[in-house]
From Swiss-Prot:
Function (record text): Essential serine/threonine-protein kinase that plays different role in the viral life cycle. Phosphorylates the host small ribosomal protein RACK1 thereby customizing the ribosomes to a state optimal for viral mRNAs (which contain poly-A leaders) but not for host mRNAs. Facilitates viral DNA replication by inhibiting host BANF1, a cellular host defense responsive to foreign DNA. Phosphorylates host BANF1 on serine and threonine residues; this leads to BANF1 relocalization to the cytoplasm, loss of dimerization and impaired DNA binding activity.
Family: Belongs to the protein kinase superfamily. Ser/Thr protein kinase family. Poxviruses subfamily.
UniProt induction comment: Expressed in the early phase of the viral replicative cycle.
Sequence positions that bind ATP: 22-30, 45
Organism field: Vaccinia virus (strain Ankara) (VACV)
Protein's recorded name: B1 kinase
Length: 300
């Protein structure tokens, strides 16, 4: 359905005139609105992923909470957007859910493609640190992102040095009342996320925990440096079991993973991925240590 021209009424009774379609993905379509600062994200209510996003926005992404966390951690920027409003729209046969969210600029995937599918190491390390800061905030609220990738990292419209991790349709609550979710497989959750970057735990049907997001970020940084992961082409065939098995082969052999992917082994990624692979499912990472490792790649 094309929503352009429709007038949507949100939960606060404000009206939004839907403009042209500017993006479409696995978790909804994105349209401009009559206010250039915002876009509207729409999908059928039955799909459920926008409800997951809406719940995450309302429970976790409160501006006051983010600001307080930034001050307490001495971190200048957390790349998470907030939700302006939400609501439902009913057509003749289908009911739709919509969110009104901040309008951003180009995504990182477009930037990488415009640079011959390769970014300088310094840029990759800086992006890695930004995403690390962002997922640390999420993790300390008890949530994992579950789908970190270049197309879900978006530049600010004005300040191109600010990045945002978007698309919260696969967020998972791995902590509840101070207790970590148990290490129990759910066959219905197997292989969630983007196959090339899905963490091994998710392949097996476990809820993505902190180590899963960090693992995915490691795979992404290899790709942003221009590398081709050993399972990249297999991912295109949608053979989930073979992708999972191939990833498992490299868990204890990070140097080989890097040499196979990049033809060299950057010290920072060698240390980063090795440390990720040493984490247990329940373990809280030492984010400062991960930041320090990546920061070495910024200056050396």
């Amino acid at each position: 359905m094309n929503f352009q021209g429709l007038v949507l009424t949100d939960n606060c009774k404000n009206q939004w005139v839907v403009g042209p379609l500017i993006g479409k993905g696995g978790f909804g379509s994105i349209y401009t609105t009559n206010d250039n600062n915002y876009v509207v994200k729409i999908e059928p209510k039955a799909n459920g992923s926008l409800f997951t996003e809406q719940a995450f926005y309302t429970r976790v992404l409160k501006p006051s909470v983010i600001e307080e966390w930034k001050k307490s951690h001495n971190i200048k920027h957390v790349g998470l957007i907030t939700c302006k409003a939400f609501g439902l729209y009913k057509s003749i046969n289908v009911e739709y859910r919509f969110l009104v969210i901040n309008r951003l600029g180009a995504d990182l995937d477009a930037v990488i493609r415009a640079n011959n599918n390769r970014l300088p190491k310094r840029s990759v390390m800086l992006i890695g640190i930004e995403i690390l800061n962002t997922i640390q905030f999420m993790h300390e609220q008890g949530y994992s992102h579950g789908d970190i990738k270049a197309s879900n990292i978006v530049l600010d419209q004005i300040d191109k040095n600010k990045l945002y991790l978007v698309d919260y349709g696969l967020v998972s609550k791995f902590m509840s009342n101070g207790e970590h979710v148990p290490f129990i497989r759910n066959p219905n959750k197997m292989d969630n996320g983007t196959l090339e970057f899905t963490p091994i735990d998710s392949h097996k049907g476990y809820v993505v925990s902190r180590r899963g997001d960090l693992e995915t970020l490691g795979y992404c940084m290899i790709r942003w440096l221009g590398g081709i992961l050993p399972w990249t082409k297999i991912s295109e065939t949608k053979n989930c079991a073979l992708v999972s098995a191939t990833k498992q082969k490299y868990v204890n052999n990070t140097a080989t993973l890097l040499m196979t992917s990049l033809q060299y082994a950057p010290r920072e990624l060698l240390q980063y991925i090795t440390m990720v692979n040493s984490l247990t499912y329940f373990e809280e990472p030492n984010y400062d240590k991960f930041r320090h490792i990546l920061m070495q790649g910024v200056y050396y």
